[in-house]
Amino acid sequence: MSNPQEELLPPSAEDDELTLPRASINKIIKELVPTVRVANESRELILNCCSEFIHLISSEANEVCNMRNKKTINAEHVLEALERLGFHDYKQEAEAVLHDCKEVAAKRRRQSTRLENLGIPEEELLRQQQELFAKAREEQAREEQQQWMSMQAAAMVQRPPLADGSVASKPSEDDDDDDDDDY
């Protein structure tokens, strides 16, 4: 018989693939007992127990599957395995979870077929989408044009008009130099 301390040791590299992710186990522990600090040794024991439980259920479900000459283990095989191993309470909870999963899957299927049930061909939907994109581009160009025109108008307000109606330009430095020579 093996030493109980050896069973608590982390699994070897080859067994590491057969365990649940430690982060998942830690999250479950934290959710179930948020105010309790759980030692690493206890976490490792829980991880090993979970892995052993899954292995036990999987093996029994495989036997049920083989007895029925099936090649794929399905939910009914797992539920029967729970029953055969004496986990009647787990079976009832597993059935409830299975029912919920089936409802979610059916809802997902309904949502994915919603586009198909519109009755509009995909080509028409694509054409409508392209039209909407073109309208959005036109609207954006119009807004940018209006913004540009308002900036131009603001710049015109800052420059005073000349007598002939044209707008005075900012004097250049060369013009200033010419004026100094006249004195």
Curated annotation (Swiss-Prot):
Assembly and binders: Component of the Ada2a-containing (ATAC) complex composed of at least Ada2a, Atac1, Hcf, Ada3, Gcn5, Mocs2B, Charac-14, Atac3, Atac2, NC2beta and wds. Homodimer. Interacts with NC2-alpha/Drap1 to form the dNC2 complex.
Skewed-composition ranges (Acidic residues): 173-183
Region (Repression of TATA-containing promoters): 92-183
Annotated protein name in UniProt: Protein Dr1
GO CC term (a single one): nucleus
Key word Disulfide bond present: no
Database matches in Gene3D superfamilies: Histone, subunit A
Similarity annotation: Belongs to the NC2 beta/DR1 family.
Organism: Drosophila melanogaster
Claim: S-adenosyl-L-methionine is one of the keywords in the record: no
Signal peptide feature range: none
Keywords assigned: Activator, DNA-binding, Nucleus, Repressor, Transcription, Transcription regulation
Residue ranges of domain Histone-fold in the record: 19-82
Compartment list: Nucleus
Gene of this entry: NC2beta
GO biological process: chromatin remodeling; negative regulation of DNA-templated transcription; negative regulation of transcription by RNA polymerase II; positive regulation of DNA-templated transcription; positive regulation of transcription by RNA polymerase II; RNA polymerase II preinitiation complex assembly
Domain of life: Eukaryota
Primary residence: nucleus
Region spans: Disordered: 155-183
Function: Bifunctional basic transcription factor. Activates transcription of DPE (Downstream Promoter Element) containing promoters while repressing transcription of promoters which contain TATA elements. Together with Chrac-14, promotes nucleosome sliding of ATP-dependent nucleosome remodeling complexes.
UniProt GO MF annotations: core promoter sequence-specific DNA binding; DNA-binding transcription factor binding; protein heterodimerization activity; RNA polymerase II general transcription initiation factor activity; TBP-class protein binding
